[in-house]
Amino acid sequence: MNVQKPEGKDTTLTTTDGIAARLGGSPGLIVQEVGWDEDCDSTLSEAIEDAIGSELLDEDSYEICDIVLLWWRSDDGDLVDGLVDAVRPLADTGRVWLLTPGNGRSNALAPGDIAESAQLAGMVQTKAERFGDWQGSCLVRRGNKQ
């Protein structure tokens, strides 16, 4: 969504601060990114990096983190396994942002599949957000509603 600035320049409301706020990114948080590939929206990754003031941890890191950005497509395998793996480096109060292709896109996941997989992985969905062509589902450990 674009708005006109007084001086006539377009600015996108879904960039840096807006995206970071919706994902819960803030200075000092540790964020790991898993499953990134060429089809992903790098704007999300860059917005989080700007908000936290550091680079994202890659998927091979074993550092405890506050947020995991998990890019997932229907052909990536078993989502339950992916979620269980994503929870391992997560702090007790952390959250996983599951980012899947939006409805109607190739490799999209049905909302029911996400809910069922989250439940089987011991997680619950606390909110959903649309980020361009990607659908975001915020997941936390069961009993840790944020």
Predicted region positions:
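S-adenosyl-L-methionine-dependent methyltransferase catalytic core, i.e., the SAM/SAH-binding region
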Residues: 2-146
